[in-house]
């Protein structure tokens, strides 16, 4: 029985996987079976870490806001600041508040004074 070479479909599939693994090293770059395993693993990690990145950034923003509120005596804690913001219906998300807390803490103090005046 003569040998039948595989068609272009398998070659196209392998070159596509190889293009995903272009920055890998060693066997992860050269061997087809290892390439498919590592590319699948990389895709799983990237899918998982897209969700994790959102959680991590939210945690970072909350930490920055909490530190700024305690240092500059805006309110006693982060939770009281967020509670008063929502009670007064001021629409500032945590990302914006963290940016204000890091770049210009005086504006954070001004925001807290606005909340107290509305009371």
From Swiss-Prot:
Example of a GO cellular component annotation carried by this entry: ribosome
Task: Tell me the GO molecular function terms.
Answer: rRNA binding; structural constituent of ribosome
Gene Ontology biological process: ribosomal large subunit assembly; translation
InterPro entries named among the record's database cross-references: Ribosomal_bL20, RIBOSOMAL_L20_CS, Ribosomal_protein_bL20_C
Keywords for the protein's UniProt record, in alphabetical order: Chloroplast, Plastid, Ribonucleoprotein, Ribosomal protein, RNA-binding, rRNA-binding
Which PROSITE patterns does UniProt cross-reference here? RIBOSOMAL_L20
Q: Which domain of life is it from?
A: Eukaryota
Gene3D superfamilies referenced in this protein's UniProt entry, alphabetically = 6.10.160.10, Ribosomal protein L20
Q: Where in or outside the cell?
A: Plastid, Chloroplast
Disulphides: none
**Purpose of the protein:** Binds directly to 23S ribosomal RNA and is necessary for the in vitro assembly process of the 50S ribosomal subunit. It is not involved in the protein synthesizing functions of that subunit.
Assigned protein family? Belongs to the bacterial ribosomal protein bL20 family.
**Protein name stated in the entry:** Large ribosomal subunit protein bL20c
